[in-house]
Amino acid sequence: SFDDFKSAAILIGTFDWSHEPLHALPDNGDGFHLPATIVHELTHALGILTQVSITPNGQYAFMNDYFGLWGQGLRDSNGKQAESGMTISIGGTDFDGDFVLDNDTYYSGVYFTGNHVQEVLGEGTTLSFPEIGLEQYEKLVPGLPVNGAEFDFEGKIFFPELSHIELQNGLLSHQNWRNWTIPMEAELAALQDVGLKFDRKQLFGYSIYASGSEDKLNEFTNTNGYYARENGQWLVGTPNETRLGIGLHIYGSYNKVTQAADILTVGEDAVGIRVEGVENHLTIDKNISIKSDGPRGAALLVSYGRDHTINLEGDVSALGEQGIAARFDFGDNILGNDQEYRGSWLWQGGYATADRILSKINGPLVKVFNVSGSLRGREAAIYIDESAFVEEINILSGATLEGDIISRWDPDNPK
């Protein structure tokens, strides 16, 4: 029995498990991604976890004996900090200093904050709760959105779960569709805020969580590169060797980003630049190198959203085994494609209905991809997955391409 264990154990149940290794994008088909699940559960064991109890008068409260740094970083829908023993109000009513959830649904205005998280998000950045097909919750929060009330595993008890970071499609979320196999940088920052000590920059060069608007793009020149690390410092010009590392991650929407520093990696499954969100404009400057030359590397990966514009003026390469220089691909769902499947204008299973489509995928993944620089990939210079529609590709004067151009786009694909 579990009572006999002298060390920790993770009980994950029986599913149709896929043992596919961790890659930049999941490739597990209809199976439930076992390695990604283990990473998810380990983050709970490492401290991203809320424990609640029921008081004699029937209210939920934060447990006194299991209230740590994660609990201290939680804020309710009014910005109030959680405290040990504080009662929790589900439904927006504040009784004598309760920790208030705006409503009794999955999204209720709760968020997590800490010094490391704020360092990653940047001053003044607010985040929305992700679009997953439920009735939308429009509130913006100055931290990491956290899930609210959920049913327990038996579907009997409705309780404040408060243990999952709700970044769009994130590994550490409770969303029904997730295409991340590793934590995003802001999630790693949360682990630092709950006490773990590690060099976050080994895995992420820089991340952009801020958003502009349709009327006014958020303009940013990224002078942060990605190289090897030593004693917490960049070794400029030396490629990073970290597996699954990412040089630049664009999470927010309506950004106009110019990449003005080299990104150099030879790590397995590493990514130069990963783009998500809606209507982001990315320019890779002339004389800038984005190199992801390790096995299964992707120099440019556009993995979610719609209507992005990419201008490639520099030197982009993925010269390792199975390397793809420019990859346009939503990837699989770590819960299995039979649970929910997404792509450009594609939404099946889960909360999907026949008469609507999620706004963030209601359009081409990429509106225009302009190439005037160098694009070299060992497996492909350009790869378009069956899930992803790229509206326009322009190979301009002065461009150099080495490698295949592969398009598998299929709006009726069998997944």
What are these regions (language model features)?
Residues S1-V39, H44-E219:
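Extracellular zinc-dependent metalloprotease catalytic-domain scaffold
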Residues S18, L69, R75, D94, ...:
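A generic structural micro-environment signature
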Residues E185-A189, V271, G403:
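Active-site-proximal helix/loop capping residues that flank conserved catalytic or ligand/cofactor
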Residues S213-E402, W409-K415:
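Surface-exposed loop/turn motifs in large extracellular/passenger domains
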